[in-house]
Curated annotation (Swiss-Prot):
Function, as annotated: Catalyzes the oxidation of either pyridoxine 5'-phosphate (PNP) or pyridoxamine 5'-phosphate (PMP) into pyridoxal 5'-phosphate (PLP).
Organism listed in the record: Janthinobacterium sp. (strain Marseille)
Protein name: Pyridoxine/pyridoxamine 5'-phosphate oxidase
Positions contributing to FMN binding: R60, I61, L62, L63, I64, K65, F75, T76, R81, K82, Q139, S140, W183, R193
Subunit architecture: Homodimer.
Gene3D superfamilies (alphabetical): Electron Transport, Fmn-binding Protein, Chain A
Length: 211
């Protein structure tokens, strides 16, 4: 079988305007809850896409840690490639892909750092070894080899033990959405796409897109 012959026909569900909540965050909460109940592997995993000042895009998988009316929140190293790109261009796109449910959610908007207090609270809730890794790794920067990386970790572990502090370059981002699209796979590639976009008055407008 060639790659071109690999395909799946989606038949599980449908999505109409009447099925969706007027509030896209509430609609996301509904779908996220259904992904949890369906035991979708890592339902909180999302692709985060950023764009550098020269227009070159990059994407990576991260885990969302919170969402509410303020936006969608995750935590990372501010000195990483994504952190540097967000400093240059504070807009990003998120993508959740729940394969067992044949669903996707696309979210676009402006990104801001969360408060130091919020970053600190989440950092202290992480497992100790994850906190040590945040100190040991200069994310997205070159390292000689795995041995050198593990040596950096061992040094940090010896220094801080069970109480590693949050580095200043580590914290949270929150994306304030202005565009959210809910995609439900359908048969014959005639998929359902319901989009919410903010109008000039800051109100959500809902409409359907052709697949």
């Amino acid at each position: 079988m060639s790659i071109a012959d690999i395909r799946t026909d989606y038949t599980q569900a449908k999505l109409s305007e009447l099925d969706t909540d007027p509030d896209p965050v509430a609609q996301f909460a509904k779908w996220f809850g259904e992904a949890l109940r369906a035991e979708v592997p890592e339902p909180n995993a999302m692709s985060v896409s950023t764009v550098a000042a020269n227009g070159r895009p990059s994407s990576r998988i991260l885990l969302i840690k919170d969402f509410d009316q303020r936006g969608f929140t995750w935590f990372t190293n501010y000195e990483s490639r994504k952190g540097q790109e967000l400093a240059q261009n504070p807009h990003a796109a998120l993508l959740f892909h729940w394969i067992p449910l044949e669903r996707e959610v696309r979210i676009e908007g402006r990104v801001e750092r969360v408060s130091s207090a919020e970053s600190e609270q989440y950092f202290q809730s992480r497992p100790v070894k994850s906190r040590l890794s945040a100190l040991a790794s200069s994310q997205s920067h070159p390292v000689a080899d795995r041995t050198a990386l593990e040596a950096q970790y061992a040094k940090v572990e010896a220094q801080y033990g069970e109480h590693p502090p949050r580095p200043e370059h580590w914290g949270g981002y929150r994306l304030k959405p202005d565009y959210i699209e809910f995609w439900q796979g359908r048969a014959s590639r005639l998929h359902d796409r319901i989009v919410y976009s903010l109008d000039k008055e800051g109100k959500w407008q809902r409409h359907r897109l052709q697949p």
